[in-house]
Amino acid sequence: MTPQEFYQLLSQQGIELTDRQKDQFERYFELLVEWNEKINLTAITEKNEVYLKHFYDSIAPVLQGLIDNQDHKLLDIGAGAGFPSLPMKIIYPQLDVTIIDSLNKRINFLKLLAEELGLDKVHFYHGRAEDFAQDKAFRAQFDLVTARAVARMQVLSELTIPYLKVGGKLLALKASNAPEELEEAKNALNLLFSKVQDNLSYALPNGDPRFITVVEKKKETPNKYPRKAGMPNKRPL
């Protein structure tokens, strides 16, 4: 997908990018490739692939009508090089984006990226999702949590649901749809007072299948969740 094809596809779906937004995506690509030589950010570095598999893939929640250009507080867990939240932030500048990542080198990249792209209302924190979720400044503070290919729902729900306000939504972006994954996660979702609201399936322009599971938080999360760092993975709920 060339940048031109990227713009055209967005245009067909009612999103007209300004020259500034096009420049932001271009600069994002340049910095991603440049920094990838120093720290491992992505295996995808060819320009057309980045525009398809990182940029276009990341804005799926926008294209699927799950996010609009309001000042929603959005948390991105395990964003790596900023996916999916920062491409959405470029398109919808009103979003207030927070990223938590366990690798400080990636946080340094994201800080530089945000500065270079002139993004405001973006906040980056180095640490574990399990730890920040017990902090009052983060717990139950977000309207939306996004996670792209981070973990199975059984684990992911414990890492993300505590951050949501009641009525807030987790958007889990995945490349494969395993009905048994949601079946396995039933107990975890019940314990966390949350419910699968939707399971969307669509395809990238090259035909690759993609899925977004939407989970809504129904009641406050019990204080004991999430458990200590590492536990959700070792002993899923």
Curated annotation (Swiss-Prot):
Alphabetical list of SUPFAM superfamilies matching this protein: S-adenosyl-L-methionine-dependent methyltransferases
Name listed for the protein in its UniProt record: Ribosomal RNA small subunit methyltransferase G
Domain of life (superkingdom): Bacteria
Record flagged with keyword Methyltransferase: yes
An MF annotation (GO) of this entry: rRNA (guanine-N7-)-methyltransferase activity
Annotated stretches, region: Disordered: 218-237
Alphabetized Gene3D superfamilies for the sequence: Vaccinia Virus protein VP39
Binding-site list for S-adenosyl-L-methionine: 78, 83, 129-130, 148
CC per GO annotation: cytosol
Main location: cytoplasm
Organism: Streptococcus gordonii (strain Challis / ATCC 35105 / BCRC 15272 / CH1 / DL1 / V288)
Localization terms from the record: Cytoplasm
